[in-house]
Amino acid sequence: MRCRAGVSAALGAALTLLLLLLRCDPVAAAALRGSPKGGNERPIIGILSQECHFKKFHQFGSSYIAASYVKFLESAGARVVPIRLNLADEEYDKLFHSINGVLFPGGGVDLRTSKYAKVAKIFYQKALEANDKGDYFPVWGTCLGHEELTYLTSGEILLVNTNTDGFSFPLNFTSAAKNSRLFKNFPDDILHAFATEPLTSNFHMWSISMQNFTKNEKLRNFYKVLTTNTADKLEFISTMEVCLLQHTNTPFMVSSGIQRKMPMSGRTHQAFHIPHWL
């Protein structure tokens, strides 16, 4: 069983990620989103819902948001609103201008034809436009959200099968990580724990390989890779963020690992000997 310090490091690192996602530029927020000039201490984050394909749950509704994502954001001080799948365009526009950021969660729907994909594209485009105008609107994609954002940027399905459902890995940091928006303020002990202990949970069958990333000019010019992992000798991307040189005010970050899974979910797996007493 992993030591208490290691698990505490994992939770602390996960919450540090959230602090970055939730940080709102006070000037931009006040100017464009009606926040007080002192900034927004309780930012509102939208979580994209997705279609429910489990028939036994259809009695409760046709779409869902995993509760662990809500708990994860609320644990960092955010308020959460659902982004539903069947709203009119004007309703999405109103919702976009009423929130401070968006999270595209993990799941299992089609990256091109699902309602999840359709609504993700709407908020992706609106976020790009807002950030280009000087607003600060962060977008975080986890697992399926990571895959969706790479598709929206590249226009191609570039996934490869890595069979990484139910594994935990340490992170292999790239040279870009040290000065990245995401990791530059991490304490050294947290970075060391991430690099040496298997603290990132993975529940995905598909990944973006470094080879496919490097070959795609749109991805290469938009994102920089911060961490990778290797499965069966295939190197795949586990964390990346927007290139600041090209898109200075665009806080888009993506992760294939699921940071909220261990502290917020009761699911267990033989590959994870992580206690849930935190």
Regions found by a protein language model. Name each.
Residues 2-241, 246-250, 256-278:
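N-terminal beta1-alpha1 cap of cysteine-dependent amidohydrolase-like domains
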